[in-house]
Design a protein with these regions (language model features):
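Conserved catalytic/coupling modules of large nucleotide/cofactor-utilizing molecular machines
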Residues: 1-170
Length: 170
């Protein structure tokens, strides 16, 4: 536990040893400033991530004792596993604001749950490269305005579907 003036951050060794860095337990950690420090685009893109990850971690622990999972539980575990993988970031390789927004927006709209967990990072990087090459104006708009309009959000989801179709054809 690390106490800070605007809340508390709970670190977990299990997360650390599984490759999550920083190993923050989002279900227990609390911050009063967190949202105020984010751009509007990031706030909109990451809307449900904290809750989704907390639910995933809870469900992951619960399902360790169960061998028979229904389809909804399997889908939620796949989604949570995808989010966990996407939040892992190599040392000294930060993503730009627009790359983070595109990643979170597509992930929270379940555009990557079809990808096997071990291939999620490659899929993410390939998708971001596709955005950069085919639709650079999307990244430019996010960087310039720091906003994620409904129209831009829809465009991102359309491009993500387009990339998925192209990736499946390869």
């Amino acid at each position: 536990v690390i106490s800070i003036t605007d809340g508390q951050i709970f670190l977990e060794s299990d997360l650390f040893f599984s490759g999550m860095r920083p190993a923050v337990n989002v279900g227990l950690s609390v911050s009063r400033v967190g949202g105020a420090a984010q751009t509007k685009a990031m706030k909109k893109a990451s809307g449900s991530v904290r809750i989704d990850l907390a639910q995933y971690r809870e469900m992951e622990v619960f399902t360790q004792f169960s061998s028979d999972l229904d389809d909804a539980t399997k889908a939620q575990l796949a989604y949570g596993g995808c989010l966990m993988e996407l939040l892992k970031q190599p040392l000294c390789h930060p993503l730009t604001l627009h790359q983070q927004v595109i990643t979170l927006w597509t992930a929270t709209h379940k555009k990557m749950v079809h990808v096997d967990k071990k291939n999620v990072k490659k899929y993410q990087m390939d998708m971001l490269e596709y955005f950069e090459n085919a639709y650079p104006e999307i990244g430019r708009e996010i960087e310039e305005t720091k906003q994620l309009s409904d129209e831009l959000g829809e465009k991102i989801l359309q491009v993500a579907d387009e990339f998925k179709d192209r990736a499946a054809a390869m």
